[in-house]
Amino acid sequence: MNLNLSLEEVRKLSENYNVIPLYTELLVDTETPLSIFLKLKEKGQFNILLESAEGGEKWGRYSFIITGSSFYLRTRKDIGEIYERGKVNFFETKDPLSKIKEVVKKFIPYHDERLPRFWGGLVGYFAYDVVKFYEPVEDKNPDPIHTYDIYLVLTDVVVIHDNLTGKIKVVVPIFAQNGIEEEYERAKNLIRDTVKKLKERGTTFLNVVEKEPDFKNWRSNFTKEEFEDIVKKAKEYIAQGDVIQVVLSQRFRKRFKGNPDNIYRVLRFLNPSPYMYYLDFDQLKVIGSSPEILVRLEEGRIETRPIAGTRKRGRTEEEDKRLEEDLLSDEKERAEHLMLVDLARNDIGRVAKTGSVRVENFMRIERYSHVMHIVSDVVGELREGYDALDVLKATFPAGTVSGAPKVRAMQIIEELENERRGIYAGSVGYISFQGNMDMAIAIRTAVYRDRDIFVQAGAGIVADSVPEKEWEETVNKAKALMKAIEIAEESQEE
């Protein structure tokens, strides 16, 4: 087995760095990221798959399969716990992001130029309710799913699948402070075991049964009348001038009798998206196909991409072009998009160098598998003294899932919705050893816990919203995920 570094080379690098990637490279052109994930996943350990389909039409260059961890950090309300090398320490906090900062600041990584921008770090999610630590928003609603507010796993084994070449790199970080020889041996053994599993294990085929979702199988936390009532109340706040827009959501749940792995398998071909993820945290699983970035930080460049304005895809190229023109000439859609662009500029401006915030590719159309959207890029340069956690705090949660002005909209959401949002409308992604970050908005995302499956969807309420139409919008948004879940439940593994 060829490795990128010898023990002596690692020892030399450890004079300047305390996190050093050890890896081997293999040609596995008969495998897919999903088949690799299914071969490597183990019950009782952390298993994560991160993929991307650019524009929903072609797969991104790299997919990441992450297994195992000897460290995690998770919080629920003001109590947190850190698991490290077999020991659990509990802590109280009113500022959980500062605790994560402490962890990230310890890393001094060596970056091998042959590796992509992510090869390890913290991976997981931030629930929507984390914002209640940092903004004057109450936390009074019940939490029926009982998920953690923050759940981050430090990567152990990362398999980087290059979708262009068919090669993989099996990467394990060496933590110098734990002893160079011991860590080198540990990393080498993990790489060897991972390669062995890939060679020995088979995968199953899925006999897919196409069907439309049966809405009777699902139970919402609102009746239709109750949801229409909260839309009316939101419109009263809008009429009084409290907010311009507020995003209200409802949550659907059902008992799930199948294999949760198959939800991701079905979702992957039904609705490929820029951010696809499967976080398998044993009893808790987060399965998503999000079209929308929350924020990205890469080498000091901050980027977010407000998405607002939607049309269904046409059946032909000519119909697509007509629908694009119709979307770009819709004053209501343009106004909503402009509001979100302004919100993004303000958010990034809190942590960017003065004068560096700008809008690029303003109001272009991006096509996805089933819909097209108006998209703009808002970028800026990170101000001295700030890091990924500051950027997350400044931009969290997205305006597309809260409203504008953001703080007042969130206060109204807390008043009118009847349950904690949890993972919905939060973010899923990573903070790398180098301090880079890529976070998706947790929409079009299913949460599986103890054989129950939850799907949540929202609608942006504005002055001229029709309550029944807004209820229909939340149902229609949820249906794509419901369809994947019900197909997964009916399909047979072979």
Swiss-Prot record:
One of its GO terms (biological process) is L-tryptophan biosynthetic process. The keyword DNA repair does not apply. Its EC number is 4.1.3.27. Chorismate binds at G309, T310, Y424, R444, G458, A459, G460. Binds 1 Mg(2+) ion per subunit. It holds the Pfam family Anth_synt_I_N. Keywords: Amino-acid biosynthesis, Aromatic amino acid biosynthesis, Lyase, Magnesium, Metal-binding, Tryptophan biosynthesis. Feedback inhibited by tryptophan. SUPFAM superfamilies: ADC synthase. L-tryptophan binds at S52, P274, Y275, M276. The keyword S-adenosyl-L-methionine does not apply. Its cofactor is Mg(2+). Belongs to the anthranilate synthase component I family. Part of a heterotetrameric complex that catalyzes the two-step biosynthesis of anthranilate, an intermediate in the biosynthesis of L-tryptophan. In the first step, the glutamine-binding beta subunit (TrpG) of anthranilate synthase (AS) provides the glutamine amidotransferase activity which generates ammonia as a substrate that, along with chorismate, is used in the second step, catalyzed by the large alpha subunit of AS (TrpE) to produce anthranilate. In the absence of TrpG, TrpE can synthesize anthranilate directly from chorismate and high concentrations of ammonia. Heterotetramer consisting of two non-identical subunits: a beta subunit (TrpG) and a large alpha subunit (TrpE). This is Anthranilate synthase component 1. It comes from Aquifex aeolicus (strain VF5). The lineage of its organism: Bacteria, Pseudomonadati, Aquificota, Aquificia, Aquificales. The gene is trpE.
